[in-house]
């Protein structure tokens, strides 16, 4: 049963915060690639960033240790889902085009529809079918329909696609959670990100988990610690609103990342963004809008 939350200032503030958080994620690829270029390819960039954030938050972890330990199982489960989403997404940013990574991540309306049918027992309406078809067609266009077989072309594509699946389920669980402080959810998210990244380092092979000298990590850490000034507000503005807003609305509001990410990738990195990418973007965004506004009409 959906939790009752007043549509007053709290939801408005959360919505504005999420739009800002999404826009901040839109330039997240820049520090990820800078760290990767420092000799930390694949999953290593994310490991350094999430580790730096946890180091900064150590005092908060210590102060809240009793509360964290009392609900560690719940936090670990949700932290694994949300952490996996952004661990995979972070890794994808250094292994495929930024635009492809962002668009493949934002197929969340498709996964949200499937989760609603399978987990929440929701009905399959015309609006939902339309959103599903639009999202899948947008995916095919982005992956090269008409030019080549529309299939993820590299490991980065697969990681971005998988990250959106984890986020769809993770944001649903965040919304369903009992009242747990957003700060604790952020800590769980960071721990989950580090945990999943560590697992990838163990089993990912040379492409994802190349051997790195400890000195390279130590050299990158001051930069990563400085970046937490930017990263921690971004993480909070992603996790906190997701505990208050319905998952469909979260997916739509976070799409401010698409606008910022696509523009910065085209301007700064010179990545291609032509008619095919624009069409895919419109279709995926339209699928998300159909999902949220169509759901409102049927409730």
Question: What feature does the model see in each segment?
Answer:
Residues 26, 30, 79, 83-87, ...:
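Hydrophobic/small/kink-forming positions within alpha-helical transmembrane segments
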Residues 18, 22, 26-34, 57, ...:
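Transmembrane alpha-helical segments that form core, pore/gating elements
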Residues 13-21, 61-88, 132, 155-163, ...:
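Loop-to-transmembrane-helix transition segments
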Residues 4-5, 53-69, 137-150, 193-220, ...:
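Membrane-interface helix-cap regions at the ends of transmembrane helices
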Residues 61-64, 108-133, 259-278:
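C-terminal transmembrane-helix exit sites in multi-pass transporters
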Residues 127-146, 276-293:
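Hydrophobic transmembrane alpha-helices of multi-pass small-molecule transport proteins
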């Amino acid at each position: 049963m959906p939790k009752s939350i007043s549509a007053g200032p709290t939801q408005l503030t959360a919505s504005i915060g999420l739009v800002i958080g999404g826009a901040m994620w839109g330039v997240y690829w820049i520090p990820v690639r800078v760290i990767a270029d420092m000799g930390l390819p694949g999953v290593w960039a994310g490991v350094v960033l999430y580790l730096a954030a946890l180091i900064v938050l150590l005092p908060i972890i210590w102060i809240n240790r009793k509360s964290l330990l009392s609900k560690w199982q719940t936090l670990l489960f949700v932290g694994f889902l949300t952490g996996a989403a952004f661990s995979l997404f972070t890794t994808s940013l250094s292994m495929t085009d930024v635009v492809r990574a962002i668009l493949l991540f934002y197929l969340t309306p498709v996964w949200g529809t499937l989760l609603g049918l399978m987990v929440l027992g929701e009905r399959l309406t015309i609006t939902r079918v339309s959103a599903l078809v639009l999202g899948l067609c947008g995916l095919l266009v982005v992956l090269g329909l008409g030019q080549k077989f529309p299939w993820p072309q590299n490991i980065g594509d697969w990681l971005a696609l998988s990250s959106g699946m984890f986020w769809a389920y993770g944001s649903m669980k965040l919304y369903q959670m009992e009242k747990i402080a957003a700060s604790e959810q952020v800590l769980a998210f960071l721990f989950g990100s580090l945990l999943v990244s560590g697992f990838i380092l163990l089993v990912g092979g040379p492409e994802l988990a190349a051997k790195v000298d400890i000195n390279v990590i130590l050299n990158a850490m001051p930069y990563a610690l400085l970046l937490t000034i930017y990263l921690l507000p971004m993480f909070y503005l992603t996790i906190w609103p997701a505990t208050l807003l319905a998952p469909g609305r979260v997916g739509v509001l976070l799409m401010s990342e698409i606008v910022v990410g696509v523009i910065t990738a085209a301007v700064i990195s010179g990545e291609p963004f032509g008619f095919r990418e624009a069409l895919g973007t419109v279709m995926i965004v339209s699928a998300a809008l159909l999902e949220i506004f169509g759901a409102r009409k049927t409730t």
